[in-house]
Amino acid sequence: MRVHAIEAFDDNYIWAIETNDKDKVIIVDPGEAQPVQQWLEQNSKSIETILVTHHHYDHTGGIAELIEQSPCPVIGPENPEIKTLTKTVTEGDELTVGGIQWQVLTTPGHTLDHISFYTPGFLFCGDTLFSGGCGRMFEGTPEQFTQSLLKLRKLPGETRVFCAHEYTQANVNFALKVEPENAVLQSYAEKVRMLREQEQITLPSTLQLELAINPFLRFDQKSVIAAANKHAESVKNSPEDVFYTIRQWKDNA
């Protein structure tokens, strides 16, 4: 399965997924219409279906214009703020879109309505999980966000992670504050630095890599727990408390 990144705004990625029909693509989280329209024209493609992970405008703002130009199904979480949906989905739903079998995972935390789309080898997780980080906790609770991340941790390690923002360099710089002696993280940070110096994309990541370097997936590791306790100057042992401590640390960094 081939996936293409369409850059939008300052740091968003809209994903274009090739389907069994060589002339059509699935578009994930089109926050802006113009970059998608330009990419479609340059590549002689049209949209089969739009997938939406959550209601934030930088993930949905381009939908109305795109479907006005070329009507297509729009699939996403149940939320009245997403007025363009033609089908709502939730945990456990299975879809066939573009000849591809998809599983829907509810992943609240960043927002309450957040979902992710998974097909073997590929995860489209919006703002739940970033390379080296995770989304800000705007609506959910630490318990909800932790459960969402635990759910993603169970996916196969070779799963490629397609998140929605180019935040990797800032994320790994923060991760190094949490685990400065993590050799895998040190190596990855250097790779990311070189890619960004060349204005190259750092995504997709893999779940195996994220499990080795991402403090928001490593909240039960001794080194991350110790860093959280040191930062908070108190004992934080539960996954939820450790996660919340490092999330607040990152928010205020």
UniProtKB/Swiss-Prot annotation:
GO terms for molecular function: hydroxyacylglutathione hydrolase activity; metal ion binding. SUPFAM superfamilies: Metallo-hydrolase/oxidoreductase. Keywords: Hydrolase, Metal-binding, Zinc. It catalyses: an S-(2-hydroxyacyl)glutathione + H2O = a 2-hydroxy carboxylate + glutathione + H(+). GO terms for biological process: methylglyoxal catabolic process to D-lactate via S-lactoyl-glutathione. Zn(2+) 1 binds at residues 54, 56, 110, 127. SMART domains: Lactamase_B. HAMAP family: Glyoxalase_2. Monomer. Belongs to the metallo-beta-lactamase superfamily. Glyoxalase II family. Thiolesterase that catalyzes the hydrolysis of S-D-lactoyl-glutathione to form glutathione and D-lactic acid. NCBIfam families: GSH_gloB. PANTHER family: HYDROXYACYLGLUTATHIONE HYDROLASE, HYDROXYACYLGLUTATHIONE HYDROLASE GLOB. This is Hydroxyacylglutathione hydrolase. It comes from Idiomarina loihiensis (strain ATCC BAA-735 / DSM 15497 / L2-TR).
